[in-house]
Structure formats: C-alpha cells, structure tokens
Swiss-Prot record:
This is Cysteine--tRNA ligase. One of its GO terms (biological process) is cysteinyl-tRNA aminoacylation. A motif ('HIGH' region) lies at residues 30-40. The keyword Iron does not apply. It holds the Pfam family tRNA-synt_1e. The gene is cysS. It catalyses: tRNA(Cys) + L-cysteine + ATP = L-cysteinyl-tRNA(Cys) + AMP + diphosphate. It comes from the Bacteria.
Length: 464
C-alpha cells in the first residue's frame, strides 16, 4: 500500500488514484534561459524515480512536464546573445535534454511548451475576469485578486492576514493587494507578444501551469510536483487560480523536493553559488550524481560537497563490485524477500535511502556466495540488478564502471598541485600562516598532505 506525503495536508496519505491503476502526474519544468543546474537535476531525478516505480508497480502513468519558453529572463538573455527567442529557446531545450539524458532521466510522455498554449491561457484568464477573480489595469495587464479566494494560502499553510502583514511588496497603483499577481503582462514588442482581448501581451508565469494541466488532464491530477522553492508563491498561485477557474480542486497530492545546500547556503543565482549539471558531469560519473540525489530522502535538503559525492561513488562501487564477474540475467525467485523489503521501503513515501540499504544487503549476500555457489550468486545478482534497474541504476558494465575516473573533484589535480607548490614557496619564505591556510583549505576537501624530505605528497582522506 503506497503512502505519499501530501504537502497540502502535511501528512502521509494512502495513495488512491482518481482512476484505478492510472496516474496523472504533472511536474513544473524548466524555464529555459540558461543551462540546467544541480537543483533541476535533483528534482527531475526524483520524479523520474517516482514515475519508474509507479510503472514498476503496475500503474499506467501519464507524465507531463512543461517547458517555460517565454518570460523576462528569456527575453533578456536572448536579446543579450542577439538571437531570436525561438532560436534561443530551441537551443536551450536541446542542451537541457542532453543533461537529462546523461542522468538517465526519461523523457516525459508530454513536454508542452507554454507558447503553444496561448489560446488556452487567454480562455482561462477570460473566465477568471468574468468570475471577478481577476481585474484589468488600464495599461492592459490582467491581475489576479487573491482576496477573491478565501482559501488562498492553504497549500503553503499561511493565512492571508499573515501574508499581507509580512509582505515586502510595495503597494502600487496597479494592484489592489500587494500580493495580487500578473496573469497577462502587456507588451508592445511584436516578437514577445500575442493578441488578446486586453491588447498585446504575454502570459504571467503562474497561469501557464494551470492552462497546461487543464489541457492535458482537464485538471484531474493525481500528483503535482516540483521543487520546494516553488511552493510559494508559484504553486499557491497556481492552485488558487485553478480552483477559481474550475470551482473545485482536482489535484489530490502535492509533492515537493528539498533544496540543494552548498556550503550551508541554499543554492541561488543571487548568491552566485549555482552549479551547472554539465560542469559537474565533466568530472563526475552521471550515475554517481544520480545516486547522490537519491541518497537523501526526496523531501529533505541535500548537502552538495565532494565528500558526499565520494560516498555516493563508494556505495555504487560496492554494488558494481558485487556484480562483477557474475551473470545476472537469469530470472528466478531467489531473493524475493529482498524484493518485498524493496516494495515496503518504496511504498513508504519513496524511501530511497532505505532502498539503498536493501541493495547493500543483497550485495553482501552475493559477496558471501561468490566462490561457494555460482548459481545462487547469479540468482541474487539478478535480483539486485532487476530492482536497481527499475530505479535507473546498475545499467553499466561493472568492469567499465570500476575502471572509470570516479568522482567530482572540486579542485582538479592541476589545481591541487599548484596549491601544494604555492604552499612550498610560502614555507621556504617562512610565511607559516599562509602555508597553514593552504593546508587547512586542502584538509577541508579531504586532501591530506605529507611532507617528505624532498617533496610534498597528498592523498584522499577515505576515513572521513
């Protein structure tokens, strides 16, 4: 019996699909103004895992993940690069797919682009105006009135009063309430606008998802997902306008992934600590990064550092070492007790850390049986590979994986050597504090120095 944590109720609930054995799943996708970063990777690996498991469990899943291909950031970036928007977004979408393919993220059943659904967006906005949930400013902007929805704030568990009192958004002559948000943004630039009853313009961010879910699911959604950074205001606004349009909510479960933490700070472009997936994957095996993403429960923050990537590599190395020199392609009933444990862990809100511990138990069994009973060894190897494959793991040839360069180095070998040389120069100049600071910096990255009579050598600290 599958239980999923529902953000709306803040409880784990038994998952019962709206239609038996069918799951409608929608995830907010990427705004394609730049390359995908580690936060995108974490969220979409998580929902890829969820889709894989639901299908493994016998559900027919319709998975839709949108692409936002028009907004202010896209306009700014395409203008800066002197490219037409369609050309720019097409290239960014292509790069997104490259990154996701490397991580083993399956292509959704549908990947709608916002600009293909402008008519649907206009239709919903028109209805919201008629129902007095939205108003038109004289400049052509259409704005949603949060005061028209008495349940606004329910998803993020915030009252309208507290939101208004805590708002730092200055009241302007456009909005009746500082928290009101744009449904349609007026624009006279031909390339960036569409005709509407209110004049030329383009859609606001929040209305896009409401329109797309209406088209593909008629707002009948079992699971709606995204990163926790989208909970407020994006998902709150999306939920509010969708309910006001339909007169009811047809989203059963809201799911949110935890933030990526870098140096004890959440990842943010404003903080300048964004790590692009493609840069990480230059030095890190993609399966190691995927394992890292799922080594922490999806709802919890995940701490990105070299040490944790090393741990992910070490874990995968153990599993591949167990599979090495086995023939895991013989379907059998050996190890079904482990499969039951696997189901129990996954049915507990997709508890992947518990699943990984089950994989280790099977691997230990394989290692124990090696050189004792090759037939049983292969049977348990099949069970390990079968279960892991269904979450996107252990597809590589064990020998090839074990021979690869293993994990991300935040410092390259050349950079490490340059720091050691800089430290040696400082020591020769008796700049002891500078030399010690370099040593401490390397230690913080689990690099241990050893000073010999004629040189300094280094090694990774594998005990940490």
């Amino acid at each position: 019996m599958l239980k999923i944590f529902n953000t709306l109720t803040s409880t784990k609930e038994i998952f019962t699909p709206i239609k038996k054995n069918r799951v409608n799943l929608y995830v907010c996708g990427v705004t394609v103004y730049d390359f995908c970063h580690i936060g995108h990777g974490r969220t979409f690996v998580v929902f890829d895992m969820i889709v894989r498991y639901l299908r493994f469990s016998g559900f027919q899943v319709k998975y839709v993940r949108n692409i936002t291909d028009i907004d202010d950031k896209i306009i700014s970036k395409s203008t800066k690069e002197k490219k037409k928007i369609n050309t720019f977004t097409a290239s960014m979408i292509k790069e997104m797919h490259k990154d996701f393919d490397l991580l083993g993220i399956s292509v959704p059943d549908e990947e709608p682009r916002v600009t293909d659904y402008i008519d649907n967006i206009i239709r919903i906005i028109t209805t919201l105006i008629k129902k007095k949930h939205a108003y038109i400013h004289k400049n052509g902007d259409v704005i949603f009135s949060i005061d028209s929805d008495p349940n606004y704030g329910t998803l993020s568990r915030q009252s309208l009063t507290s939101l208004e009192s805590g708002s730092r958004i200055p009241l302007n002559n456009m909005k009746k309430n500082p928290l009101d948000f744009i449904l349609w943004k007026s624009s006279n630039k031909e390339e960036y606008s569409w005709d509407s009853p209110w004049g030329k313009g383009r859609p606001g961010w929040h209305i896009e998802c409401s329109a797309i879910t209406n088209v593909f699911f008629n707002n009948s959604i079992d699971i709606h997902g995204g990163g926790s950074d989208l909970l407020f205001p994006h998902h709150e606004n999306e939920r509010s306008q969708s309910i006001c349009f339909n007169n009811k909510s047809m989203i059963n479960f809201w799911m949110h992934t935890g933030m990526v933490i870098l140096n004890n700070k959440k990842m943010s472009k404003s903080l300048g600590n964004v790590y692009f997936l493609r840069n990480i994957l230059k030095d890190c095996d993609a399966e190691v990064l995927r394992y890292f993403f799922l080594s922490t429960h999806y709802r919890h923050p995940i701490y990105y550092c070299e040490k944790n990537l090393d741990q992910a590599y070490t874990s995968l190395k153990y599993l591949y070492t167990a599979l090495y020199d086995t023939n895991p392609f013989f379907n059998n009933e050996e190890g079904l007790n482990f499969e039951l444990e696997f189901y129990n862990a996954m049915n507990d809100d997709f508890n992947t850390p518990a699943v990984f511990s089950i994989f280790f138990k099977i691997a230990r069994k394989i290692n124990f049986l090696k050189n004792k009973d090759i037939l049983k060894t292969n049977k348990f190897a099949f069970r390990l590979k079968y279960l892991a494959n269904n979450l996107g793991f252990l597809f590589q040839d064990p020998k090839e994986f074990l021979q690869k360069k293993t994990t991300l180095n935040l410092l390259t070998l050349k950079e490490i050597q340059l720091l050691i040389e800089k430290r040696n120069i400082a020591r020769q100049s008796k700049l002891w504090q500078e030399a010690d600071n370099i040593r401490k910096k390397l230690m913080s990255l689990d690099i241990i120095l050893e000073d010999l009579p004629d040189k300094t050598i280094w090694r990774k600290n594998k005990k940490s």
